[in-house]
UniProtKB/Swiss-Prot annotation:
Family listed: Belongs to the ABC transporter superfamily. Macrolide exporter (TC 3.A.1.122) family.
Alphabetized UniProt keyword annotations: ATP-binding, Cell inner membrane, Cell membrane, Membrane, Nucleotide-binding, Translocase, Transmembrane, Transmembrane helix, Transport
Organism of derivation: Pseudomonas fluorescens (strain ATCC BAA-477 / NRRL B-23932 / Pf-5)
ATP-binding recorded as keyword: yes
Record-annotated ABC transporter domain positions: 6-244
Quaternary assembly: Probably part of a tripartite efflux system, which is composed of an inner membrane transporter, a periplasmic membrane fusion protein, and an outer membrane component.
Name assigned to this protein: Probable export ATP-binding/permease protein PFL_2149
Predominant location category: membrane
Length: 652
């Protein structure tokens, strides 16, 4: 006689209730050959269901040995037991145990998903099984749209999906009417005829009468094991055969499982829209806060830096004396036009301009104003990046011939001429020198500039020779070439000036240091605000964990069903972890979209500057979403994977 397919020796199963321990099974010895149709009967509480659970590797024995096709199960871990359930057993439950949010076809496919069967083959087999059971027109129907008999046929198809070498049917007709029950028993007999080993657990003698062999269990012991010969025409006409579909290779199977985890996660999330929305709300708020704050900070930084650049962030100013406030500075008259010429020869220097200035009286008609009169070179407007609103600036030729021309600023234009008079070509008195207005600068909206100051500019030669009567310079302004390091250029300027003067009787002022300070400050502020926003992300993550823990509790029976059809602990853990990550990623995407919407509204109401979104902040936001999903989804996923399949299936 061949080795039994299922062989139990001395199997006992005890349970603890408080301080008491009781035996549900007592020293069970049982062998079941491949291809048998066996009925296990007994009253409620007799131990028959516990025996079925041990046979199906859903439960474990406290003592004894249980072999499946010669393989000892006693020392197998949870993963190996899951593989045994997946490869050998198909379960048919009294209450069908179909997942309500999946269609009939997807319910049937579930065991093959965990077996790693390719999608095309999986779909084909599910259709074939459902068609064989008369459900070809109900592939897309959910359990709530099917009758009890139809649901049980879906359950049978699911049991056969991976071959179902052993069919374990727990009260398969218990929830059905007589006609549907008879139909299900006919299907089980057909499966037996095809070579499947069919084990029926029932308390109904009429159902048990369909089996070849009837085993009666009472008080945890087998009290009867008798043959029940059927008419010859009903006996199996073929030897047992394996109809298990070939699985995919390991790598392909793993990738397929990961893909299916995403599909199943999406179905689960869509099936509970309100819960999903509330779960991701905290993530949406957190991501929106982080991305928006970073964008506002970057926009503010660029706005400030732009204003600094407008007053000369890439310029170096040279002044007489040791530093600002030096009492000896007025007596030092060593800055000369020749220094400007020498500085213009340096490779690092884009342009340099002399500067002299005094507060003098301006007069036009009967209007007198005090303004700062600046004597500069024709390069001054390039050095300071000052744009003209109208007219032109003076030329090098104007400087050589000490032309009596002047460029005025926007404030001076308004004060002297008003809005209705074109100042170009008008003659004004600068001190006692009549000068023709040839240009007007744009209005200065720089946040670092005093908005009410009046400035006019003359060629340096004109100002020094005809207005101020001095040859030395008050200061020199040097514009650095683009791309050149400011500190390096500053050192070369200092070295050249010391060589020319023979001593260090000057000091330099470089606005680049101010720019760096602003950048550091803005980074610190953005970091501070981001940390505050991250707190909301953490709160959102805790919300995800709480809802996922609730979800695990609500879906305990689903977890038990998945384990019964072959899901390993790692599959369950991956399923819930993927759900948590998906919630956070969707929340992150919504949060980023909201940030862009806020940025658009921001530009409508605030014209001076705008929010600046960077790819780095968006990638960081998605990375944070993923990390939060993994970190805060791990505990619920771990709890789900650790559930006992028997307890999970028993949960309502």
């Amino acid at each position: 006689m061949s080795e039994p397919l299922l062989h139990l020796t001395g199997i006992s199963r005890s349970f603890t209730a408080g301080d008491r321990e009781f035996l549900a099974l007592k020293h069970i010895d049982l062998s079941i050959q491949a291809g048998e149709m066996v009925a296990i009967t007994g009253a409620s509480g007799s131990g028959k269901s516990t025996l079925m659970n041990i046979l199906g590797c859903l439960d474990y024995a406290t003592a004894g040995s249980y072999k499946v096709n010669g393989r000892e199960t006693r020392d197998l871990d949870d993963q190996a037991l899951a593989e045994l359930r997946r490869d050998y057993f198909g379960f048919i439950f009294q209450r069908y145990h179909l997942l309500p949010h999946l269609s009939a076809m997807h319910n049937v496919e579930m065991p093959a998903i965990y077996a790693g069967t390719p999608q095309v083959r999986r779909h084909g087999r599910a259709r074939e099984l459902l068609a064989r059971l008369g459900l070809s027109g109900h592939l897309g129907h959910r359990p709530s749209q099917l009758s009890g008999g139809q649901q049980q046929r879906v359950s049978i198809a699911r049991a056969l999906m991976n071959g179902g070498e052993v069919i374990l049917a727990d009260e398969p007709t218990g929830a059905l009417d007589t006609a549907s029950g008879k139909e299900v028993m006919n299907i089980l007999q057909e499966l037996h005829g095809l070579g499947h080993t069919v084990i029926i657990v029932t308390h109904d003698p009429k159902v048990a009468a369909n089996a070849q062999r009837i085993i009666e269990v009472r008080d945890g012991e087998i009290v009867s094991d008798r043959a029940n010969p059927r008419p010859a025409d009903e006996a199996p006409s073929e030897p047992p055969v394996s109809v298990r579909p070939a699985g995919a290779r390991r790598l392909v199977a793993s990738l397929g499982l990961f893909k299916e985890a995403f599909v199943m996660a999406w179905v689960a999330l869509v099936s509970h829209r309100m819960r999903t929305l509330l779960t991701m709300l905290g993530i949406v708020i957190g991501i929106t806060s982080v991305v928006s704050i970073v964008a506002i900070g970057e926009g503010a930084k660029r706005y400030v830096l732009k204003d600094i650049q407008a007053i000369g962030s890439n310029t170096i100013d040279i002044f007489p004396g040791a530093s600002f406030g030096d009492s000896r500075a007025a007596a030092i008259q060593t800055l000369m036009p020749a220094d400007v010429t020498a500085l213009n020869q340096l490779y690092y220097v884009d342009s340099a301009t002399p500067m002299v200035g005094r507060s003098l009286l301006l007069r036009y008609g009967n209007i007198d104003l005090n303004a700062t009169v600046n004597g500069v070179s024709h390069l001054y407007f390039q050095v300071r990046d000052i744009k003209l609103a109208s007219g032109i600036s003076f030329s090098e030729n104007d400087a050589r011939r000490q032309a009596q021309v002047v460029v005025i600023d926007h404030n001076t234009r308004n004060r002297l001429f008003g809005p209705d008079v074109d100042p170009l070509g008008q003659v004004i008195l600068v001190g006692n020198l009549p000068c023709t207005v040839i240009g007007v600068t744009r209005e200065n909206k720089n946040m670092f500039a005093a908005s009410n100051l009046l400035n006019v500019w003359l060629p340096y030669e004109t100002a020094a020779g005809r207005v101020l009567g001095q040859r030395h310079l008050d200061s020199i302004s040097v514009r650095i070439k683009d791309g050149q390091p400011s500190k390096v250029v500053e050192e070369h300027v200092k070295k050249l000036m010391e060589q020319r003067h023979g001593t260090k009787d000057f000091f330099t002022n470089n606005l680049d240091s101010i720019m760096q300070t602003v950048q550091r400050t803005s980074r610190s502020l953005a970091l501070l605000l981001s940390l505050i926003a991250v707190i909301s992300l953490v709160v959102g993550g805790i919300g995800v964990m709480n809802i996922m823990l609730v979800s695990v509790t609500e879906r305990t029976r689903e977890i038990g069903i998945r384990m019964a059809v072959g899901a390993r602990q790692s599959d369950i853990r991956q399923q819930f972890l993927v759900e948590a990550v998906m919630v956070c990623l969707i929340g992150g995407a919504i949060g980023i979209s909201l940030s862009f919407a806020i940025g658009y509204l921001f530009t409508l109401f605030i014209k001076e500057w705008e929010m600046v979104f960077s790819m780095g902040s968006i990638i960081t936001a998605f990375a944070c979403s993923t990390l939060i999903g993994i970190v805060f989804g791990f505990v619920p996923a771990r709890n789900a994977a650790r559930l006992d399949p028997i307890e999970a299936l028993a949960r309502d």
